[in-house]
Amino acid sequence: MLTLYNTMSRKKETFTPLHPGEIRMYVCGPTVYNYIHIGNARSAIAFDTIRRYFEYRGYKVTYVSNFTDVDDKIINAAHKTGEAPLDLAQRFIDAFMEDTTALGIEPATAHPRASQMIPDIIEFVQDLIDKEYAYAVDGDVYYRARKFKHYGELSHQNVDELEEGASQHITQDELAKKEDPIDFALWKAAKPGEISWESPWGKGRPGWHIECSVMSTKLLGDTFDIHGGGQDLEFPHHENEIAQSEAKTDKQFVRYWMHNGFVTIGEDDEKMSKSLGNFITVHDIRKTVDPQVLRFFMAGTQYRMPIRYSETNLKNAANSLNRLKIARENLTYRRRGAETGVDPQITKQLQTLKDRFVTAMDDDINVQNGLTVLFDLAKLLNEYANEETVKSESINDLLNEYDAWLQIFGVVFADQKSLDADIDALVKARDAARAAKDFAKSDQIRDQLAAQGIILEDTPQGTRWRRQ
């Protein structure tokens, strides 16, 4: 039974999709004004892992993740570089796709952009004005937050407390325009030199929150299963999305809210963020760290928990990944000479492990417990590889399940079915030299292979080789 922690209820709930066998989910994507840092990547990796597990469980997943390409940060960055805002946004969208591809993140079913949905956004805002949930002032349009009776429920905050906080963080100009300090912008009047579009309220551009409401409901419907994002988006972004969407449709917006934890760095476990200037971009880290190691490191922590970034933790992830790789290579090698048929004991052990894996992952995607079972499966691969007699169908069953679990964590190892002919020939030549007790030649071949990054392992079943 699959359970997910719902931020709205603050508890784990049994997951029941709106449409049997299908999951529709929306995950807030990046504001594209810079390269993504590993804190941004954590969210993308966490929800890619969740999506992959849903697919492993047999669900058809429609996964939408947006690009915010109209925003104050983009306008400011473009002003500094001299680029047009949408050109700068496109440059960093391309960089995002390159980084996430390297991290083994599957492309979303759709990657909508705010700039491509301006007519839909204007229509959405007008509907809110018509229903008296919004009002226009001097080209700006604001949402009447207090009118929405459920405002504050997602973040579990009292409206009066929100008012006190909002009053301390808005300008005098905003305070003069707004009916209430907690009201927020749906549409912003154009400023000189800024990108803008024509609207019933004059030239302007959309607010951040309205963009996600429009993109998600247009592509997934008025009500969909899961909305995800970082914990920092819970308020005000997701709170405001709910207010806008449910005021317009009079329907529940999202059934399950999922929020991932932060990446921390340094001795004080400070949150990694661009605003604090303590971030490391994926673009830069890829120059020195294998992206698959970074992916495995990130995917190995339950999505709601914080991740501490450190060289030590990366090294541990690399070592764990290598153990998993070696286990696969060991059993793959035994395909040679395997007898046809199935080993009933292996079938039974594999089923037990599958049941344990699903039980672990069904508990709010508990990847730590899931990885424990994955390493137990790796142990079984190694043990079976050392058996004197192995069955071909059992090898295939073990490797197929192993690969399916690895892929949930974004790990794909190169198949060892077709070994390099030259290396194979050298291994056979070394075996012949050993049989002839020509140990000098045997050692010379071992050294030659080692120089190519090939490690040899002498076992009772023959010599195996693997790449470092």
UniProtKB/Swiss-Prot annotation:
It is an enzyme of class 6 (ligase). Its EC number is 6.1.1.16. SUPFAM superfamilies: Anticodon-binding domain of a subclass of class I aminoacyl-tRNA synthetases, Nucleotidylyl transferase. One of its GO terms (cellular component) is cytosol. ATP binds at residue 274. The keyword Manganese does not apply. It is found in: Cytoplasm. Its cofactor is Zn(2+). It catalyses: tRNA(Cys) + L-cysteine + ATP = L-cysteinyl-tRNA(Cys) + AMP + diphosphate. A motif ('HIGH' region) lies at residues 30-40. The keyword Nucleotide-binding applies. Keywords: Aminoacyl-tRNA synthetase, ATP-binding, Cytoplasm, Ligase, Metal-binding, Nucleotide-binding, Protein biosynthesis, Zinc. A motif ('KMSKS' region) lies at residues 271-275. SMART domains: DALR_2. One of its GO terms (biological process) is cysteinyl-tRNA aminoacylation. GO terms for molecular function: ATP binding; cysteine-tRNA ligase activity; zinc ion binding. Zn(2+) binds at residues 28, 212, 237, 241. NCBIfam families: cysS (TIGR00435). Monomer. Belongs to the class-I aminoacyl-tRNA synthetase family. This is Cysteine--tRNA ligase. The gene is cysS.
